[in-house]
Amino acid sequence: MAAMSADPLMLSVVIPCLNEAERLPLLLADLQRWPFPIEITVVDGGSNDHSHRISALAGGRFITEHPPGRGKQLAAGAQHSIQQNQGKWLLFLHADSRLPRHWGSSVLRRIQHPDAQRFAWFFDLHIHPSTPARRLLEGVIALRSRWCQQPYGDQGLLLHRSLYERSGGYAALPLMEDLEFVQRLSQLTRLRPLGLAISTDGRRWQRGGVLRRSLENAWLRHRWRRGESPARLAAEYYGKPFSTI
């Protein structure tokens, strides 16, 4: 049988997941607004809820990477999509994300531009539910993403398959996988805003409030850049014993 050629307008979506049965259906419904064929790969880290069934009902592929680790899950999902040789564009999203209503037509216009595949693309971030402190944080993140070329994983990442492969793809890190990847990407190309806002669940900002959590995250990033083990930092971030990460 001849190898299937990649569809230039097919979108290959990779979603790392761990016990997201409550939020995953909303994102999967949003993704159905893509006006062309779409391939959805949910990479699970060992969920014990209904994430598998939900993914199957939405027509997505469900693969398992255990023990969980977002970098490992993202890398596995991308590799799976590339091996299928269907979509030329890869879109990485977190399972608790929500896409705006007209995201499909907006992204389609973007990738049809002749120069689009030269760049990597990210969404602006909206944290739900909204508070004044979170609005301020969103503004800081928008500036950081544009000026420093360092969007967070919560903002999603869209890039052509050829650019992903040239960059080396996601590293199998338990933490900081998003920053490590965009740092390598920024050495090859510019990361550009899509001009759309993606919503993320604000649960991670509830513990200690926005300021405290932002300072904790900044300290973790500083220690990572200084060379500390991502596994040790992940254990601290997720509140798990170092040996289980």
Language-model-derived ranges and their functions:
Residues E22-L26, D49-A58, H102:
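Acidic helix N-cap motif at the loop->helix transition within catalytic regions
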Residues A29-I38:
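Short, acidic, metal-binding catalytic loop of nucleotide-sugar glycosyltransferases
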Residues L90:
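Short aromatic/hydrophobic "clamp" motif used to bind/position activated sugar donors
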Residues E65-I82:
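Glycine-rich, basic loop-to-helix element that forms the pyrophosphate-binding segment
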Residues R101-A133:
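Conserved donor NDP-sugar-binding/catalytic core segment of glycosyltransferases
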Residues A2-S5, Q183-I245:
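Hydrophobic helical membrane-anchoring modules
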Residues D44-H52, S97-R98:
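A conserved acidic beta->alpha catalytic loop
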Residues A120-R134, I141-L159:
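A recurrent flexible, glycine/aromatic-enriched loop bordering the glycosyltransferase active site
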